[in-house]
């Protein structure tokens, strides 16, 4: 069986990958995540997912390396991690009553053969009309300062939404497991067979 490495320091991505019950290591890649001038969301997250996987290929030369990246698009603009409470409140205020699209790029690199699989999975979140006090209360309670879109859907953030639309709800948390399981099976790793 191939050894697997998750190219991420995200505890959320690690928790998602653990759902597949396959042993893996994780290591944070060191890459420049700056968007290119004029780059759109879907190509950007796919490029960064591939770059994260490729960044670990030399360190893990006989592994399947998983890279992932995510961003959210609000009003046609890429919205990054808020980093401060004020920015999180501003993002959620802009999002209330609107649809926000998340793009998650996924890459699986076989570092021994060089075979690369990559895709981008969209996921749409429809926000309820929110009151200012709800937004401020949510940000204070959950502190989603490291989360694209300023929320955690796996926690209290679910109360912000009217609807969720997408193929795989894991995509919204940062790792599309349906697509990843398909990629792993193509590399001979089936989570249902040991």
Curated annotation (Swiss-Prot):
What are the recorded Gene Ontology BP terms? Answer: nucleotide metabolic process
Q: Which cofactors does this gene product need?
A: a divalent metal cation
List, alphabetically, the HAMAP family matched.
Answer: Maf
Which species is this record about?
A: Sodalis glossinidius (strain morsitans)
PANTHER family in the cross-refs: 7-METHYL-GTP PYROPHOSPHATASE, BIFUNCTIONAL DTTP/UTP PYROPHOSPHATASE/METHYLTRANSFERASE PROTEIN-RELATED
Reactions the enzyme catalyzes: N(7)-methyl-GTP + H2O = N(7)-methyl-GMP + diphosphate + H(+)
Output the InterPro entries linked to this UniProt entry.
Answer: ITPase-like_fam, Maf-like
Q: Report keywords, A-Z.
A: Cytoplasm, Hydrolase, Nucleotide metabolism
- GO CC aspect terms: cytoplasm
Q: Where is this site: Important for substrate specificity?
A: 12, 70, 154
Primary role: Nucleoside triphosphate pyrophosphatase that hydrolyzes 7-methyl-GTP (m(7)GTP). May have a dual role in cell division arrest and in preventing the incorporation of modified nucleotides into cellular nucleic acids.
What top-level class of enzyme does the UniProt entry assign? hydrolase
Name a Pfam family for this protein. Maf
The similarity annotation says:
Belongs to the Maf family. YceF subfamily.
> EC number(s) for this protein?
3.6.1.-
Specify where it is mainly localized.
Answer: cytoplasm
Which GO terms label this protein's molecular function in UniProt?
A: nucleoside triphosphate diphosphatase activity
Q: NCBIfam families in the record, alphabetically? A: maf (TIGR00172)
Compartments where located: Cytoplasm
Keyword set includes Hydrolase: yes
| Keyword Cytoplasm listed | yes
Which sites are catalytic?
A: 69
The identity of this protein, by name, is 7-methyl-GTP pyrophosphatase
